C-alpha cells in the first residue's frame, strides 16, 4: 500500500490582516452621502459669492474667519443664495398698507392720482391766473381747474396738474452733475465740522 496522498488544507486567516467593516450598511450609506455633499460644498466655495443687496454693483462677500476685523456676519447657508430676499422689509411694507375705517384693506393710490390731488401750483402762476380771472366772466370755466361747488369753496383753487413723469428722463450728465453737487456739499460739511472742532478746542 502506498503512502496516503497529502491533502492541503486552506490556510486560516491571519487575525492581523482580517479587516471587517463594523459600521451598519445604512449608516455607511448616510456617511457616503454626507461626504459627497461636503465635497460639493468645498468645490462651490472656491469662488467668493456676490452680494446684491448693499450696492447696485456686484462685489464679493467677505468670508467669515475667526478674526476681530471681519465686517460681514452671515450664516453658512447664505453664501450660496443668488439674491437674498428682504423678508423683514416686505413684511413691514405689508403692515403699512392703507386700511379703511372698517379695518378692510384698500388698494393703494397711484402716484399720478396723488400728484393730481396734492400738487400745488406755484405762487407766480396762481397770481397771474387770479389777475386773468378778474377779466373773465364768472360763468366761464377756467382750464385746469375743478368746477365750483354750490355753497362751498372751489376744491381745485390754486392746484395745477404737474407735467407727466414719463417725459422727465435722467441722463448720464444729470447723474454726474448731481454727484458733483453731493461731493461739494460733503466737502463744505467736512470743512465746517473741522472749523467747529478747532473752535471748541480753542475754547477749552
UniProtKB/Swiss-Prot annotation:
Residues 126-137 have a biased composition (Basic and acidic residues). The MBD3L proteins are encoded by strongly repeated regions of the 19p13 chromosome. The exact number of functional copies is unclear, and some of them may represent pseudogenes. GO terms for cellular component: nucleus. InterPro entries: MBD2/MBD3_p55-bd, MeCpG-bd_2/3_C_dom. Pfam families: MBD_C, MBDa. Residues 126-145 are annotated as: Disordered. This is Methyl-CpG-binding domain protein 3-like 2B. Belongs to the MBD3L family. One of its GO terms (molecular function) is methyl-CpG binding. It comes from the Eukaryota. It comes from Homo sapiens. GO terms for biological process: DNA methylation-dependent constitutive heterochromatin formation; negative regulation of transcription by RNA polymerase II.
